């Protein structure tokens, strides 16, 4: 049976994630007390082959060590194919979402302000965050974007196969929190300053032609390829499910997009399971 444990700070998108997983055929249980997880697996494994469980900060055991031990036991005992997703967003975004929804934070009942509750939740969820197979930062995601991202991550993964995600972004919007590696392309020649190239993106042929003619750009790409090709086998042997490679330039329109596309193409040719995401190409969609 496949098991996905969904966790994350309140307001980061867990409810959306569970709804998407239900649409994908998962039997979903919301806010399950963690100590009941082994019993739940036993009770439903004969009826369902896909199970998703959402863990809320209110349902954690008192001891972080007990939480880590229990999840490690479920992961290692071999009854299920275990994956864990952790959803998060910047503090300012969570504050904004709570202000707009007028909902009460789960920890606000403990006489904490909203800001204090968010910081306390960060501490309590640290064991889940640090051991997650996939971390998704929803700060700049619309509900549609988040739904599509979850579908891609779940459906695009074959059993025991590492998924290599290339993610372009603009530093002006912040570094993606889900990136395992981040490469800074801001020192490379910038098509933004060439009037006839400025309106295009790194996916368009005029920009691609210009950047591919720049020796520094191509050497940068080659060196990233070589580094990843060297260390991916070690990550695969370490049972990693996902490796996310962030490529950043100033605005996330030209250089980072081109480089991410080139790297994705190169590793597809090597037979890797590759996914690509351009975080800031279209920031006009309604945000989550």
Curated annotation (Swiss-Prot):
TM ranges: none
Organism field: Aeromonas hydrophila subsp. hydrophila (strain ATCC 7966 / DSM 30187 / BCRC 13018 / CCUG 14551 / JCM 1027 / KCTC 2358 / NCIMB 9240 / NCTC 8049)
Signal sequence, renumbered to the chain: none
Gene3D superfamilies in the cross-refs: P-loop containing nucleotide triphosphate hydrolases (3.40.50.300)
Protein name as annotated: Nucleotide-binding protein AHA_3920
Residues given in the record as GTP binding sites: 56-59
Swiss-Prot/TrEMBL keywords: ATP-binding, GTP-binding, Nucleotide-binding
Family: Belongs to the RapZ-like family.
């Amino acid at each position: 049976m496949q098991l996905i444990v969904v966790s994350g700070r309140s307001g980061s998108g867990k409810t959306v994630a569970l709804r998407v997983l239900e649409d994908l055929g998962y039997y979903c249980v919301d806010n399950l007390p963690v100590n009941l997880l082994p019993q739940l697996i036993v009770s439903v494994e004969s009826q369902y082959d896909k199970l998703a469980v959402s863990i809320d900060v209110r349902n954690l055991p008192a001891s972080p060590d007990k939480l880590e031990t229990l999840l490690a036991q479920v992961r290692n005992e071999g009854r299920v194919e275990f994956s864990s997703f952790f959803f998060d967003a910047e503090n300012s975004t969570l504050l904004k979402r709570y202000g707009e929804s007028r909902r009460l934070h789960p920890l606000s009942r403990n006489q904490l302000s909203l800001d204090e509750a968010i910081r306390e939740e960060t501490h309590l969820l640290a064991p889940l965050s640090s051991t997650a197979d996939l971390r998704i930062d929803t700060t700049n995601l619309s509900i549609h974007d988040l739904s599509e991202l979850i579908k891609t991550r779940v459906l695009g993964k074959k059993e025991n196969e590492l998924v290599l995600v290339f993610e372009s972004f603009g530093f002006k919007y912040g570094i993606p929190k889900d990136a395992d590696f981040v490469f800074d392309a801001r020192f490379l020649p910038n098509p933004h300053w060439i009037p006839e190239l400025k309106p295009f993106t790194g996916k368009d042929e005029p920009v691609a032609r210009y950047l591919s003619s720049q020796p520094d750009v191509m050497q940068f790409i080659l060196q990233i390829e070589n580094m990843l090709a060297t260390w991916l086998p070690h990550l695969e042997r370490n049972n990693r499910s996902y490796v996310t490679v962030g490529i950043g330039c100033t605005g996330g329109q030209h250089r980072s997009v081109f480089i991410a596309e080139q790297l994705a193409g190169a590793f597809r040719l090597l037979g890797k399971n590759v996914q690509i995401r351009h975080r800031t190409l279209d920031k006009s969609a309604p945000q989550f």
